[in-house]
């Protein structure tokens, strides 16, 4: 077993890929009987300090319908200088530059350790990075001041040749001219009128040099100053002026009467930002960064009226079809998101307010373009300030951890087809023989566009086996998949990262144990969870839970060992043993349970779940719990109410929150001030240890989690109590004896009851 775990670990570290199955069933029928689809989690730009990019272009297969890239799985005839493509078997000539290759002098892309390789493309004009700030001015004074300071700080973090623009909005929308003369000029647009891209470009005077739409290319350097210099300027030229301009920003001057919301034209402001970049820099790396402190209340994209007595829509309103602005607003933002994705730009949303800001309607903007979504209470909190600062963090080479305008192309050997992808991407509608008719996620294509990428951005990619049951893949063969990610690096170079992997085929009837041993239950749980969350966007919550339950029961029936009608005989092997508890916690998670969460919160949680890597996704599904005591070093404990003991401190990491919880006795000792007495030095250290560990997590994570410090009986202890498995409740407390954790006041079923029920259904011949 350890060997497969090591194999999975090594592949993730080298290639950024985790497959649900690491030995593949050799026919379509057998693959469907496996219940969990053949799929993988791919982190296209996983950080690899040991992988410097090579300074030449990749060698492509000459077959026009294939164009796979030369890789270690290809067969090479060194004497004839020919190579055979491992996907279509086409024989190809090596280019002249490869004349000196031999068995002992191989290029990097043929060496097995370079199953992932990155190429640096030298040709083609380079375009600077573009950052367009879209700022809400209907904020409270201290909030606006804090936001202005964060924006001024961010200017110092941008590369000097980056282009920057500024749009502000309240009741009206202002597009600011950024000149070096120090005179403030802006174009003002009504916040109620929807404008086409052409109208926006005409009004801003961008049409003379705006390129014909069919020329999908970046503006050439000599065109750029004329086209956009008034609105997008290199930071090194206007740093001082823009800092002053941001400092002078005032609150929206339109009066807001009592009982009314400010009039916010978010939809028009975003539309103008998209139109401005569309006309000046199509297919160039650009970020639209929207900062908003409340819901859009007028014009296209409004999500609530200005009357405060009318609350913004809740889940209850949506279920009752009582959210009157939702469909129209969602349509507006979807149209903007699709236009932005077509142009290769991405949209970030930074929403800080105590009430909802319309993230439900606007979620498609970051979701489809690979932008960030940050949600907080105020721009004046360290949560926002540090999260915003982290966007501009640098990697080991001193480059930004951001990439732009990526396309992901997936190629498969002929026994496989691509069913779809789930992640921050849009389809490029590239059909081909390797595209399946059955869609899972965003399907019907073998290529996707990801406009904004960072080293942790992860996609779930789903496949299906082609071969019929009566003509399975021959034994001993290997199936192969190649992932080709072309992107604009933050240094503005064009790069291509290529990952080529292979796995063995096995006959599911004679080698089921072999397939079973190669099951990656962590990857499978995340891939199934992504499918569930994807379905939850368009289906009723209970239907999604029923679907997940059915899949779990079928999986247990297929791979469990049991005697018919005898639940006590049920066993799962080590490679499946954790999977049911992942599903138990997933069912209770905020991704599938909307109770107690606003529509905006649900959208925020789902946004992050659909893009994080495997480790972070597992923390979201099943939070990690550490226990601190006098009995030894901190240790991970079960996410269970039995772990909540009076003489322990607990640290829980849910990804979105870090909770420190003091047990009853510890809380009393702290209240009595023992930590300040020299003879109780060890107690002081015990209190400090979880704080230090929490600080470490807070420093590393994006977005920065909410930090909660609570104790037994504290109101915020609910964050911990709602996550742990309620093995002890008010119903069964007295059956447990005395010193065993805290009872949870809930009617939710515990993991034990869930497992008992699962065993009963799995062994029943009726189900």
From Swiss-Prot:
Q: Where does the record place it?
A: Cytoplasmic vesicle, COPII-coated vesicle membrane; Endoplasmic reticulum membrane; Cytoplasm, Cytosol
One Gene Ontology term from the biological process aspect of the record: COPII-coated vesicle budding
Keywords (A to Z) from UniProt: Acetylation, Cytoplasm, Cytoplasmic vesicle, Endoplasmic reticulum, ER-Golgi transport, Membrane, Metal-binding, Protein transport, Transport, Zinc
State the CDD domains in the record. Sec23-like, Sec23_C
Location of N-acetylalanine modifications: 2
What GO molecular functions are on record for this protein? zinc ion binding
Q: Which GO terms describe its cellular component?
A: COPII vesicle coat; cytosol; endomembrane system; endoplasmic reticulum; endoplasmic reticulum membrane; perinuclear region of cytoplasm
Name the membrane topology term: Peripheral membrane protein
**Signal peptide positions (record):** none
| Start and stop residues of the Gelsolin-like repeats | 634-720
Binding-site residues, Zn(2+):
61, 66, 85, 88
Residues bearing N6-acetyllysine are 564
Recorded family membership: Belongs to the SEC23/SEC24 family. SEC23 subfamily.
Q: What does this protein do?
A: Component of the coat protein complex II (COPII) which promotes the formation of transport vesicles from the endoplasmic reticulum (ER). The coat has two main functions, the physical deformation of the endoplasmic reticulum membrane into vesicles and the selection of cargo molecules for their transport to the Golgi complex.
What is its quaternary makeup?
A: COPII is composed of at least five proteins: the Sec23/24 complex, the Sec13/31 complex and Sar1. Interacts with SAR1A.
Name this polypeptide is given: Protein transport protein Sec23B
* Species for this entry: Mus musculus (Mouse)
């Amino acid at each position: 077993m350890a060997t497969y775990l090591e194999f999975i670990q090594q592949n993730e570290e080298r290639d950024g890929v985790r497959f649900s199955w690491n030995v593949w069933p050799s026919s379509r029928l057998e693959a469907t009987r496996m219940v969990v689809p053949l799929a993988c989690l791919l982190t296209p730009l996983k950080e690899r300090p040991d992988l410097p990019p090579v300074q030449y272009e990749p060698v492509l297969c000459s077959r026009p319908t294939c164009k796979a890239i030369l890789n270690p799985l290809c067969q090479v005839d060194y004497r004839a200088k020919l190579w055979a493509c491992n996907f279509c078997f086409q024989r190809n000539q090596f280019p002249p530059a490869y004349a000196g290759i031999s068995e002992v002098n191989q290029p990097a892309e043929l060496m097995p350790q370079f199953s992932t390789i990155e190429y640096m493309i030298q040709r083609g004009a380079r375009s600077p990075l573009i950052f367009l700030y879209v700022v809400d001015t209907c904020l409270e004074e201290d909030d606006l001041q804090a936001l202005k300071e964060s924006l001024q700080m961010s200017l110092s973090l941008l590369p000097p040749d980056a282009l920057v623009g500024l749009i502000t909005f309240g009741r009206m929308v202002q597009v600011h001219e950024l000149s070096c003369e120090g005179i403030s000029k802006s174009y003002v647009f009504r916040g109620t009128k929807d404008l086409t891209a052409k109208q926006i470009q005409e009004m801003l005077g961008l049409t003379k040099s705006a390129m014909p739409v069919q020329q999908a290319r970046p503006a050439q350097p000599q065109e750029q100053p004329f086209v956009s210099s008034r609105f997008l300027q290199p930071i090194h030229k206007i740093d001082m002026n823009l800092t002053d301009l941001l400092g002078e920003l005032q609150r929206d001057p339109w009066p807001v009467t009592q009982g009314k919301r400010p009039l916010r034209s978010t939809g028009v402001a975003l539309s103008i930002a998209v139109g401005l970049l569309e006309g000046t820099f199509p297919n160039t790396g650009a970020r639209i960064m929207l900062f908003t402190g409340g819901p859009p209340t007028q014009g296209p994209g409004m999500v609530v009226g200005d009357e405060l007595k009318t609350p913004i829509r809740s889940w209850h309103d949506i279920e009752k079809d009582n959210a009157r602005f939702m469909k129209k607003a969602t349509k507006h933002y979807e149209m903007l998101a699709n236009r932005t994705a077509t142009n290769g730009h991405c949209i970030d949303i930074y929403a800080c307010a105590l009430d909802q800001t319309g993230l439900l309607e606007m979620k498609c903007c970051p979701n489809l373009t690979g932008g960030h979504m940050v949600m907080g209470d105020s721009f004046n909190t360290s949560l926002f300030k540090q999260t915003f600062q982290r966007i501009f963090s640098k990697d080991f080479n001193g480059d930004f951890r951001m990439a732009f305008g990526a396309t992901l192309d997936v190629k498969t050997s002929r026994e496989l087809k691509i069913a779809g992808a789930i992640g921050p991407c849009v389809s490029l509608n590239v059909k081909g023989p390797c595209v399946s008719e059955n869609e899972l996620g965003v399907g019907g294509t073998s290529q996707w566009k990801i406009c904004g990428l960072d080293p942790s951005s992860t996609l779930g990619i789903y496949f299906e086996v082609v071969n019929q049951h009566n003509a399975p893949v021959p034994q001993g063969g290997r199936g192969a998949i190649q992932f080709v990610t072309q992107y604009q690096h933050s240094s503005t170079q064009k790069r291509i990262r290529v990952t080529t992997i292979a796995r063995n085929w096995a006959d599911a009837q004679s080698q089921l144990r072999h397939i079973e041993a190669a099951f990656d239950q962590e990857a499978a749980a995340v891939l199934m969870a992504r499918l569930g969350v994807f379905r939850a966007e368009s289906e009723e919550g209970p239907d999604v839970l029923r679907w997940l339950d059915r899949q779990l029961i079928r999986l247990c029936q297929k791979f469990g060992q049991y005697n018919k009608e005898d639940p006590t005989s049920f066993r799962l092997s080590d490679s499946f043993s954790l999977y049911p508890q992942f599903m138990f916690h997933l069912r209770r998670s905020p991704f599938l349970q909307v109770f107690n969460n606003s529509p905006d919160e649900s959208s925020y949680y789902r946004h992050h779940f659909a893009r994080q890597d495997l480790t972070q996704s597992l923390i979201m599904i099943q939070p990690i719990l550490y226990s601190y005591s006098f009995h030894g070093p901190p240790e991970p404990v079960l996410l269970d109410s039995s772990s909540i003991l009076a003489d322990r401190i607990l640290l829980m990491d849910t990804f979105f929150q870090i909770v420190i919880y003091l047990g009853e006795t510890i809380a009393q000792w702290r209240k009595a001030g023992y930590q300040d007495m020299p003879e109780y030095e060890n107690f002081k250290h015990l209190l400090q240890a979880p704080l230090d560990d929490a600080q470490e997590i807070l420093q590393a994570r994006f977005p920065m989690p909410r930090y909660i410090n609570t104790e037994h009986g504290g109101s915020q202890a609910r964050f911990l109590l709602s996550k742990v498995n309620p093995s002890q409740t008010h119903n069964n407390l007295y059956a447990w004896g005395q010193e065993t954790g805290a009872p949870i006041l809930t009617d939710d079923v515990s993991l034990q009851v869930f497992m008992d029920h699962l065993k009963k259904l799995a062994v029943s011949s009726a189900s």
